[in-house]
Amino acid sequence: MELGGPATAGATDTAGQLFKDELSDKCQKLFLEFLEECKGKDGSNLYVSAAEELVRPERNTLVVNFTDIEYYNQQLATTIQEEYYRVYPHLCRAVRSFARQMGNIPANKEFYVAFSDFPARQKIRELSSAKIGTLLRISGQVVRTHPVHPELVSGTFLCMDCQSVVKDVEQQFRYTQPTICKNPVCANRRRFTLDTNKSRFVDFQKVRIQETQAELPRGAIPRSVEIILRAEAVETAMAGDRCDFTGTLIVVPDISALAAGDARMETGAKVTGGEGFNSEGVQGLKALGVRDLSYRLAFLACHVGATNPRFGGKDLREEDQTAESIKNQMTVQEWEKVFEMSQDKNLYHNLCTSLFPTIHGNDEIKRGVLLMLFGGVPKTTMEGTSLRGDINVCIVGDPSTSKSQFLKHVEEFSPRAVYTSGKASSAAGLTAAVVKDEESHEFVIEAGALMLADNGVCCIDEFDKMDLKDQVAIHEAMEQQTISITKAGVKATLNARTSILAAANPVGGRYERSKSLKHNVNLSAPIMSRFDLFFILVDECNEVTDYAIARRIVDLHARNEESIERVYSIEDIQRYLLFARQFQPKITKEAEEFIVEQYRRLRQRDGSGVAKSSWRITVRQLESLIRLSESMARMHCSDEVQPKHVKEAFRLLSKSIIRVDTPDVSFDQGEDEKNVEEEVNNANLNNGEEAMETNQDEPINDKPSTNAGLKMSFAEYKQISNLLVLHMQKMEEVEEECHLTTTDLVNWYLKEMEAEIETETELILKKRLIEKVIHRLINYDHILIELNKSELKTMDDSKETSEDAAEDRILVVNPNYMLED
């Protein structure tokens, strides 16, 4: 096919039918016969009901399945494919004739045809001038959408010299006037005015798509192409959608380049030499027409569809989908597999191992990421406030602990996932940017990573390296799931219904156990509270673990595919995920009470001051507990949230919030250390013969043991404190007016530890240690409250020595303290 074919045909057609295109007329006749005769399996006409819909004023496009044309007439299908741009106007006339048979239609109404299910698909990178005018299908991700405008497709002009009317002047993607007045006497070529009442306009929208990461060659920059949508195809593709576009490649004038060329011509004409001659001179044939021949490729689409609409694309989380409709889209074998998975008693574990087969261990993170993919149930309150259902997860860990591997796995698995790096991304790149269009000079919105991941997952690596101003930009997106923009005269609120999976490194590169999580990560408190789950990965030296990891990595390098063991394939998991996400589980009465009880426990732990939380427990953690419980119910295809689902959600949340490594408890040493040393030395001297046999090295060796006695692990400290509190509570239950003093508590503890004490030195150290523990419980943790006996007596008996007052301390347990399990 010659490139000038379509343009020539159009031009001669408008110039008074001087040339008759027999090929197009034949295609029009065959296509009309196809519409009238094409029948389905039940014997009824496939396109009669669709044509009857065209009677409605808002409908003007008939969608035709291309495989039906191939089945009906292969030669017709080949001609449409190879000469699409040439025969398209005639196909539209055939649709108009077919629609008029169905009902009364206005004479001036235009109709269009769109082709779906075109078999072959081209990559954006493979588009070339050889494919201009042929029927193609391309796919990509929408990154920019322009507002809808009216486009002049056929103009009626009035000659300003002789008042003659020139009808149906086809517009070649720019404002095109008649070449000459049709009146033989009039020689006007330039002075025409457009009659808008008799001209034809159509809805027109431009969108820009770019290559997806899956199609992109390694290390290459994504290519983009502009898509032109008309009629009913407008507003069908939103920013972030992955769509298939069926249409043809066309050549359009580059308006911006033409405008720049005109400007250069105007300025260049004014520059003259010293004697009045043009200093530019004659450029020769090399530059001839360069300014005027500025064209670029664009794609004129007639049909827009979702990429893989069954198990991915933009239909992943459509609200109108139900479990029944998803089931109807599956084959019998696919449905049997989904049903088999739903009955699997070990489904939780099998999904985790199948989803991350190359990552050894880290089972808790696998469970958390899996629940993130299933997600909770989004809700809308009576006031119209939206409550998010998406789960946000953050992984904090030392280098080389497979953080980025989790993000890469999710990006490859999820049909709508965006991977980005925090340091290399700006606030506009993460949310949305307002840019100026090159042609219309209007401001349009270009989607950022969070908008592109709408109804999907946004994986952000190096999350802690983001600048503070960029972190603030995603506050709204993480909680309200919207992005508000007010700049350059554009005010908009855009959807960002995405789950965020972030990976961050600790401050200094290594996670310090002596500090809490909030001191280990360079993140603000508002950002941390918006994450539902935090996971900590510490690179520990463990012989068994190191051997298992090394064996796994060597296995992957040596045998590659053979070493990967999956219970379910990726396609099975995607299918099951799509089916399970259609469930909207409700919280039962038992689960509701259990959730309230677990949240009370979390708040109580946070308020007790003993357990070191990673951050403050707020209502957001309660909402996280609800979302995780709903996700567990969805995973098991349950319509109700049961207490067992809440239990697993609480376990994951507890690991994330409470289980923060705590440092050893160090007691103040100072002068107390000297007193301990004196008592130890006196005890050794009183032992007689043992003191005589002691050499000079032994006192030096005793010092470390003394120092070690004033320091203990947090677990030991918690064990002793729980033991003391339990004893006091039991004594209070037995005797209502129980007055336990510090001395009573010390003596009771030493009696309990009697079997472990062998020497007098150990007795003195144990006594000093328990006194320090009681002192800390009173003054720092406020678990115990001290009362002096003098406060219980009359004021006259209050004159006592400080030593007597110390001995007379009465201890009671703080009524607000709850003993941990």
From Swiss-Prot:
Oligomeric form and interacting partners: Component of the mcm2-7 complex (RLF-M). The complex forms a toroidal hexameric ring with the proposed subunit order mcm2-mcm6-mcm4-mcm7-mcm3-mcm5. The heterodimer of mmcm3/mcm5 interacts with mcm4, mmcm6, mcm7 and weakly with mcm2. Component of the CMG helicase complex, composed of the mcm2-7 complex, the GINS complex and cdc45.
GO function term, MF aspect, one: DNA helicase activity
Family to which the UniProt record says this protein belongs: Belongs to the MCM family.
Keywords: ATP-binding, Cell cycle, Chromosome, DNA replication, DNA-binding, Helicase, Hydrolase, Metal-binding, Nucleotide-binding, Nucleus, Zinc, Zinc-finger
Lineage: Eukaryota, Metazoa, Chordata, Craniata, Vertebrata
One Gene Ontology biological process: cell cycle DNA replication
Protein EC: 3.6.4.12
Originating species: Xenopus tropicalis
UniProt name for this protein: Maternal DNA replication licensing factor mcm6
Catalytic activity: ATP + H2O = ADP + phosphate + H(+)
